[in-house]
Amino acid sequence: MDRTPVDLVPALKDAYLRKVAFTKGCETVELTFHVLRRALGSREREQDRVAGFRFRGVRGLATEALRWDRDAAKWVQAKVDWLGALARDQMERPIVNGASVGLDVTLERWRKAAESALWLRGQPANLDPEVQGIVAVAPVIFELTAEVILPSGINANARLFLAADGLDVVGSKGPRDLGALLREGEDWTAKWRDYWRRRERRPELPEDPQFEWMQPTEDDLR
């Protein structure tokens, strides 16, 4: 299956997963992000940071949450439906670590986690192209990793796998595309780096909250 691989880290890293919504049976899934890596223009407002991902014709949806077991000294499955808890507004907003569309390695990771993951739609057999591979041949393969605080108050590393027939991206002003999101993320990174270089030379300059929230390392400013 030919898919265009897109690494969404430049756009979605550090974003908040603000909202989750899905139909009964999860045929349609909507994820709403509050994007921090976007430099707002003078006429833009905070609502312009919103990016909605709407997945149509969902073939498979699975999640996992790994917590650190101090007694066993290893990561173990928390066995919690964190996505459902978020949809019911029962937990704090996850912070995105990574996201991608169309990466072959996503299917590899999904297969490794298939038996222990919580399947909200589909089943592990759907990952096998020689059996019931409706997931393996899906036009859209999406993966998300995030830091979460579970309803119990425990910190965990969460992952979401999703296979669908289509993906629509929507912003505050209407339809968007992944390329535009990536360009905005790359533009923010360039402006963030320039901002901190100026601040390094002239500490008296006023702070800009669009960039101040993330402190740079020495390597970032080289």
Identify the residue ranges that each predicted region occupies:
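Surface-exposed, interaction-prone regions used to assemble/regulate multi-protein complexes
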Residues: 1-222
